């Protein structure tokens, strides 16, 4: 156990000090309030004020509010559908700060570099025959081209490109900033803000040119924009690897092992989870906003909110199952006291009280279900989703949303989502109970030996 703790401790220290992982984690955490705001927009348009599949089917008066649906749809577009803009800026800014840059120029440069490699024009066609799906160029057959960023690149599809370009561009810029010959020195009479603008001018121009040339080279070599290449050959395969039950299980085993040596496992793997599962969640939200069907085959199962729904209720290790087990089955007053204190925080998915109060750290008995319980609940959730009993995750909810309510909201206000999460809670209790009994026997034995 000590050897494992030492190895995981070194890995955890490396993860915590790695500026790239920290930049990804911090950027997604900073953007989270906007993601939730966008999810509220989806909830309003698709679940509440919707006459086809929402509350409007059963309570017609609410449809009087339909006139403001476009405003809530705009909330979704400005946040979820444009997440790459915010994440690219955030990651570039974080990398700049890690390299000693002040102000927000690094973020602006990263965003400009991403725009330089993103499709910015398309042909306008008119649909002539809907039945045959034939297309004809508008304006008497003349090609009409419009400038502007391709909408698909703004959302989940462009996320990996934005992350990569945000990191690479600012690293190039910071390296060039160290070259004294590239700094334009201005007279002391020039205001500091203007002087700094000229100081970074040449490194910024070179950086932007390098990234733009890479994008153009990619287009000439492959016939595809850089975003399409990254989305197809990097983001797609990584998502495919992560969005499998073995991949998810491995991630949650590692999270549990980190916790058992006193390291916040979710923080350590936050960047990995965000990169793999947030794009899938965003695609689910987009699809649901168009189909209103939370069981559509187009939706991904392993989206971020789904993982939180089945693998993190009550906190890491799904410890709400342990808290309930103690309150129902424990015969030791000390454990019951800790569980009583931990119940309310646990209902909001905050579990440090029970994790460090029992404690779970370096606990060879309760450490086993701490790792196994999330695997069991994820497996059950996967089965329930595959057979169509549980809808898929289509709405982002705050991570502090209580279990069962979380399942209800995440699945588009579907009662079967709440029922499915309740089943997962029962499964977590069943996993913890036998180990709790064994642990209390061990505690009693230790107490008896100490009394002799």
Q: Whereabouts are the PLM-identified features?
A:
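Interfacial/capping segments of alpha-helical transmembrane domains
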Residues: 39-64, 123-136, 218-237, 264-280, ...
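Membrane-embedded translocation segments of transport machinery
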Residues: 215-216, 220-330
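Early transmembrane hairpin of solute transport permeases
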Residues: 17-183, 361
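Hydrophobic alpha-helical transmembrane segments
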Residues: 70-87, 154-161, 241-261, 296-317, ...
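Transmembrane alpha-helical segments and their short flanking loops
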Residues: 1-15, 50, 54-66, 138, ...
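Alpha-helical transmembrane segments in multi-pass membrane proteins
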Residues: 37, 80, 84, 88, ...
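Cytosolic juxtamembrane amphipathic/interface segments immediately preceding
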Residues: 5-28, 65-69, 186-196, 353-355
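Membrane-interface segments at loop-to-transmembrane junctions
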Residues: 186-198, 233-238, 357-359, 364-365
């Amino acid at each position: 156990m000590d050897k494992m703790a030492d190895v995981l401790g070194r890995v955890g220290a490396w993860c915590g000090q790695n500026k790239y992982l920290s930049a990804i984690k911090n950027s997604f955490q900073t953007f989270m309030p906007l993601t939730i705001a966008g999810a509220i927009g989806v909830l309003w348009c698709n679940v509440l004020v919707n006459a086809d599949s929402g509350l409007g089917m059963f309570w017609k008066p609410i449809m009087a509010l339909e006139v403001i649906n476009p405003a809530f749809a705009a909330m979704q577009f400005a946040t979820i559908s444009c997440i790459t803009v915010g994440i690219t800026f955030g990651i570039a800014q974080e990398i700049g700060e890690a390299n000693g840059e002040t102000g927000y120029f690094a973020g602006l440069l990263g965003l400009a570099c991403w725009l330089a490699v993103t499709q910015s024009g398309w042909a306008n066609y008119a649909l002539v025959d809907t039945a045959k799906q034939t297309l004809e160029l508008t304006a008497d057959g003349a090609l009409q081209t419009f400038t502007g960023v391709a909408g698909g690149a703004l959302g989940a599809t462009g996320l990996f490109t934005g992350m990569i370009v945000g990191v690479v561009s600012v690293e190039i810029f910071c390296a060039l900033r160290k070259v004294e010959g590239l700094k334009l020195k201005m007279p002391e009479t020039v205001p500091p803000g203007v002087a700094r603008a000229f100081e970074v001018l040449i490194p910024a121009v070179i950086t932007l040119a390098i990234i733009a040339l890479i994008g153009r080279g990619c287009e000439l070599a492959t016939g595809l924009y850089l975003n399409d290449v990254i989305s197809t050959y990097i983001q797609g395969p990584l998502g495919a690897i992560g969005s499998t039950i073995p991949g998810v299980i491995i991630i949650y085993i590692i999270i549990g092992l980190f916790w058992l040596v006193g390291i916040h496992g979710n923080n350590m793997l936050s960047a990995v989870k965000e990169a793999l599962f947030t794009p899938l969640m965003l695609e689910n939200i987009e699809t649901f906003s168009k189909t209103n069907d939370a069981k559509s085959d187009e939706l991904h199962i392993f989206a971020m909110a789904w993982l939180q729904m089945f693998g993190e209720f009550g906190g890491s290790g799904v410890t709400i199952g342990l808290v309930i087990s103690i309150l129902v089955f424990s015969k030791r007053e000390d454990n019951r006291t800790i569980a009583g204190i931990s119940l309310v925080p646990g209902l909001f998915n905050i579990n440090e009280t029970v994790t460090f109060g029992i404690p779970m750290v370096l606990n060879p008995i309760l450490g086993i279900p701490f790792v196994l319980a999330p695997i069991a609940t994820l497996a059950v959730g996967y089965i329930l989703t595959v057979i169509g009993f549980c809808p898929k995750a289509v709405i982002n909810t705050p991570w502090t949303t209580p279990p069962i309510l979380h399942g209800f909201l995440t699945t588009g206000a579907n009662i079967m989502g709440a029922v499915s999460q309740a089943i997962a809670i029962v499964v977590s209790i069943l996993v913890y109970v036998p180990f709790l009994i064994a642990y209390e026997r061990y505690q009693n034995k230790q107490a008896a030996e100490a009394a002799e």
